[in-house]
């Protein structure tokens, strides 16, 4: 079985879901923005904090599944309008401060709004990931350590997701490397595990954060490259900077399917990540086997998306080990796990 062909096949379609659940749009049904008067004054009647925040988030993320390209002029104008409504009508609420944090991005001003939001909500745990992102970009290490620890101990991240991300890190052989992530199931668990797994030299690059100009400057500096112009698509930006660095760069399977398919000629499956660096077949095989031998608690995985990622790499390993008698024991173990997961999720066959 040819790996490139396999990458294009239905298994890849199964493991690469769209970034944001399209059902979020249906949650907005019935929520209508207040109409503007003829003189463009905002009508502030019966604003619901929760509905206004939902309206803001849907506007901000509505095109994210299409390569994150959502910072066009109309979108920015709409976000500014919603932000102004929040400031005028919601005053010192969690929702108003959170919207202002999002508007200001990963800046010192944005961080202050985030702290104010935390003071105005009982469910402080829902902000852990925001504090992690903001402190990471602003290089506030004590704050970053504080909130990654809080997140790790919060129970928000299940054991199976933690184990999966331990195996993601064990798929990466070069410590001083960069891994491009996309979602809740990899970005924050990985950040919380770097110290624990002795991978502090590994840099996590979240695709959504690249929309923030300060974050782009930070990543370009860490990659040792110039900061290229930005065309509203973080993946184009990542691929551009990747051509100017010798650093090892990896993609996780949570990235949009279109992105991985477009970059497939440059991607090599290693463990449960994709290497953007060119590798020989023998080197791929060596790294895949090493990653597999370090994998832990695969049997815990019950999430269908995570199972699909494992099934994909098991199929890659099966192909690589098919004619290697010295690795027959490894092959049998791989096949046993694959059979076990397919029995649990027959739709992934």
Give each language-model segment a name:
Residues 25-175, 193-349:
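ER/secretory pathway lumenal C-terminal domains and tails of membrane proteins involved
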Residues 1-28:
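Bacterial Sec-dependent N-terminal signal peptides
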Residues 180-184, 207:
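Short His-Asn-centered micro-motif
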Residues 186-190:
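Short, well-ordered alpha-helical microsegments
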Residues 20, 175-176:
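Generic detector of short, well-ordered, non-transmembrane alpha-helical segments enriched
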């Amino acid at each position: 079985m040819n790996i490139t062909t396999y990458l294009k096949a239905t298994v890849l379609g199964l493991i690469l879901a769209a970034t944001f659940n399209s059902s979020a749009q249906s949650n907005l049904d019935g929520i209508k923005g207040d109409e503007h008067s003829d003189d463009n004054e905002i009508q502030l009647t019966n604003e619901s904090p929760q509905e206004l925040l939902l309206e803001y988030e849907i506007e901000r993320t509505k095109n994210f599944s299409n390569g994150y390209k959502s910072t066009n002029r109309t979108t920015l104008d709409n976000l500014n309008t919603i932000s102004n409504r929040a400031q005028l009508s919601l005053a010192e609420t969690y929702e108003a401060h959170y919207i202002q944090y999002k508007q200001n991005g990963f800046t010192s001003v944005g961080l202050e709004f985030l702290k104010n939001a935390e003071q105005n909500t009982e469910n402080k745990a829902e902000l852990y990931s925001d504090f992690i992102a903001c402190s990471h970009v602003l290089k506030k290490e004590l704050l970053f350590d504080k909130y990654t620890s809080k997140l790790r101990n919060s129970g928000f991240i299940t054991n199976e997701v933690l184990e999966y991300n331990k195996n993601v890190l064990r798929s990466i052989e070069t410590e001083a490397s960069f891994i491009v992530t996309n979602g809740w199931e990899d970005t924050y668990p990985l950040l919380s595990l770097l110290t624990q797994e002795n991978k502090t030299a590994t840099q996590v690059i979240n695709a959504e954060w690249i929309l923030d100009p300060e974050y782009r400057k930070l990543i370009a500096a860490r990659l040792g490259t110039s900061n290229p112009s930005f065309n509203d698509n973080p993946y184009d930006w990542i691929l551009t900077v990747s051509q100017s660095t010798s650093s090892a760069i990896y993609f996780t399977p949570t990235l949009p399917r279109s992105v991985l398919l477009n970059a497939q000629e440059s991607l090599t499956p290693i463990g449960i990540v994709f290497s953007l660096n060119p590798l020989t077949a023998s080197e791929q095989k060596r790294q895949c086997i090493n990653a597999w031998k370090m994998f832990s608690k695969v049997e815990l995985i019950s999430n269908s998306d995570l199972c699909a990622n494992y099934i994909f790499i098991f199929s890659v390993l099966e192909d690589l080990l098919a004619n290697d008698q010295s690795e027959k024991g490894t092959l049998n173990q791989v096949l046993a796990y694959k059979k076990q997961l397919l029995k649990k999720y027959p739709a992934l066959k």
